[in-house]
Amino acid sequence: MGQTSVSALSPQPGSVDGLDKASIANSDGPPAGSQTPPFKRKGKLSTIGKIFKPWKWRKEKTSDKFRETSAVLERKISTRQSREELIRRGLLKELPDQDGDVTVNFENSNGHMIHIGEEATQEENVGKPEEGNVSVCEKGPPREEQAEEKTAGSSHPKKTTGSKASSSPSASSTSSHPRGPKESLTGKAGAVGTTRGKKKISKQPAAAASRLSPNTVTSETSSLKGELSDTGVESLKPEETVAGAEEEATGKPKAVVVALPPVTVPPSSPALPLPPEDPCTIALDTPMVLVSDGPTLPISALETSPLPGTEEPANRTTPYSSTGLGGSREQAKCFTTKDGLGKAGPQLLTPGQMGDSLESFSAPEDEAPREYQANDSDSDGPILYTDDDDEEDDDDDSTGESALASKIRRRDTLAIKLGNRPSKKELEDKNILQRTSEEERQELRQQIGTKLVRRLSQRPTTEELEQRSILKQKNEEEEQEAKMELKRRLSRKLSLRPTVPELQARRILRFNEYVEVTDSPDYDRRADKPWARLTPADKAAIRKELNEFKSTEMEVHEESRQFTRFHRP
């Protein structure tokens, strides 16, 4: 489940710690002395266009969601149990070994190696070419390996984790050339992988590969055969094509490094290496097999085909982050069959075959990034993440094409859904619809008919309803006669009304037939308010008169005189 990195021969390998790895992964471009072509950089004016395209603003949220998903996957992978533990608990079958000297290296959930078989032969074979400061595959003790990976994993940025494979950053440790600037190890340079066939590597000495003894060749080819037949190689890494190009440049055969994918609990996913720019990276998390001078391994055995042992489809890849999408383009077509590689195990890739097959292992650069937006094989469901930079470039180039493509995609998904709808026969087979014959349908109709007839026969007839006076019989002649009778009755009542003289004679009406009319002037009909017209002098005179009247003329009892109220003068 870890990241796969392969080491080639280097004059002075130096280990890169986690801090350097973080700076390498975050670097935007290649150094000055690198042989990689320059990256496709977007101009400064392309970012200004985003201001006028509000429908693209929502794309910034994808990276946050992707980072959270990566953290969750990292936590889950760190707690995953090893293969030995699962075999011990009986959840996995142990694969039988074909040869006695086969060395199969599995990795557990943390990216560490679990060595099964004879580890001494593996270390001996790897240790032989280490003469004159040349290392093919630096392989220390497991404790040193674990400590090194822990330090690397703690400082590895989360940007380079794109899926379950890339979300365990402690899975790879690199060694670089003694040159000053470091090349980017992640797949941020998307165009580098596609031009891998043109790249020539001239920094490794050509004589280092010839130091491998014939014993090393035979043991390694037999171990290759055993490992390929036992575990089933799922991918041939792009670094092998680099080694082939190196052989063509130097004219001498060199060691081809085949990285075997880790065997994990199903559902299994294909091995997902991040293509390194530097050919001298060291794989500490995947088993390494060195193949050298011997029979040739044909390219036809390495063509893409599904693995019979796995349940996943062969074309199923995992989404990479925006920095690792370029690397996935080389690895999308690198799945091999278990049977084909099991038969062709002891053979080798000759320089001519490797040179001819460079084009077959590099995917075209103009492939849409949507092809690599696939489901993750973990049980948490898909990580829906696409490369925002590539999408923005595509949208800037052809907005109409993307709209048309999305419309076609919508129609395709609708057609797929309609095509997946089960037929009537399938529903009957699944016992969702009851299977009925023509006779059964006829019987059902007859039952419904008899039930309706029985209900209708229980309804009362019109005669019964008329007898109960519920339904009245309607006749036009009778209706006309009823109307005429009503008119006659009303006219009779009106004819019996007394006349006005009769009412006057009975003194019921008392009024004069003639009315006298007189003219009168208009006047104010409002109430009269004399106090509103009194002057203050008038009011003072009234108060004085009242006081005199109360004091002299009004009869008041002597004991109650003190209670007599006088007005103010």
Curated annotation (Swiss-Prot):
It holds the Pfam family RPEL. Keywords: Actin-binding, Phosphoprotein, Protein phosphatase inhibitor, Repeat. The keyword Thylakoid does not apply. Expressed in the brain with high levels in the cerebellum, specifically in the Purkinje cell layer, choroid plexus and thalamus (ventral, rhomboid and anterior nuclei). Moderate to high expression in the hippocampus, piriform cortex, olfactory bulb, entorhinal cortex, as well as in geniculate bodies, lamboid septal zone, preoptic area and ventral pallidum (at protein level). Residues 1-13, 212-224 have a biased composition (Polar residues). Residues 140-151, 423-444, 461-483 have a biased composition (Basic and acidic residues). Residues 1-47, 98-253, 295-483 are annotated as: Disordered. It comes from the Eukaryota. Binds PPP1CA and actin. InterPro entries: RPEL_repeat. RPEL repeats lie at residues 71-96, 412-437, 450-475, 488-513. GO terms for biological process: actin cytoskeleton organization. This is Phosphatase and actin regulator 2. Belongs to the phosphatase and actin regulator family. Residues 386-399 have a biased composition (Acidic residues). One of its GO terms (molecular function) is protein phosphatase inhibitor activity. The lineage of its organism: Eukaryota, Metazoa, Chordata, Craniata, Vertebrata. Residues 162-176 have a biased composition (Low complexity). The modification Phosphoserine is found at S27, S357, S457, S495. The keyword Cell cycle does not apply. The modification Phosphothreonine is found at T36.
